[in-house]
Amino acid sequence: MFAGLPSLSHEQQQKAVERIHELMAQGISSGQAIALVAEELRATHTGEQIVARFEDEDEDE
């Protein structure tokens, strides 16, 4: 699977981590917090994108 991911600066990454921690402090699960922040980043990011390939480990088993 290929996915276009935002290319973030270190500062942007730090802000994303802080946002995830804020959401978790409000009682949201870590997975849900990560998903929400990822969705926010994809919706608002205007910089470069990187392409990542994710392999399904269960494939061919």
Curated annotation (Swiss-Prot):
HAMAP family assigned: UPF0181 (MF_00507)
Q: Under what name is this protein listed?
A: UPF0181 protein KPN78578_22920
Top-rank taxon: Bacteria
* Bilayer-crossing regions: none
Matching Pfam families, A to Z? Answer: UPF0181
Q: Give the similarity note.
A: Belongs to the UPF0181 family.
